[in-house]
Amino acid sequence: TLTAYSNSKSGQQLRVCSDKRGESTTTIASADLADFLGNWVEVEEKARFGEDGSYEVTIMRVKDGKVLLKLDPQKMDMWRTDCTGLRPKWGIYRYLGENRSWQDQLRDEEIRFADFSIKKL
């Protein structure tokens, strides 16, 4: 999961997390979210789906070519047992907190996609 995250200890960051059913989420890469705000970024993401899968991602700021986040290929289980298909999602997803307790902290956000492509390799 690629997630924008905020807490009092680490501030705002973009995290790449590995999530195994029944286990806690582990952050495997992170970057300061401030570097992303108001900027176009180019993302190259490669995923091999399967129980013996892998994941890698590079995010580069377009205006100066600075790499903001890079995760080298990681072996990981990229398939849930008994699943019959794959449903990738791109967009803004929010957790409102228990009983909507964080709702007042949310602000309007916008995400724009350009030159979007998906390839089966």
List each language-model region with its residue ranges:
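Glycan-recognition/cleft segments
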Residues: 1-19, 75-83
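Ligand-recognition surfaces built from glycine- and aromatic
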Residues: 34-35, 77-121
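Short loop/turn segments at connectors of secondary-structure elements within structured domains
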Residues: 10, 51-54, 112
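Short, surface-exposed beta-strand/loop "edge" segments at domain boundaries and coil↔beta transitions
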Residues: 21-27, 65-69, 96-104
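Short beta-strand segments enriched in hydrophobic/aromatic residues
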Residues: 18, 47-49, 61, 94, ...
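Short, aromatic/His-centered strand-loop micro-motif at the edge of beta-sheets
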Residues: 20-42
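Carbohydrate-binding surfaces in secreted/extracellular proteins
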Residues: 37, 42-76
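Short, conserved, surface-exposed binding loops centered on an aromatic residue
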Residues: 3-7, 32-37, 48-50
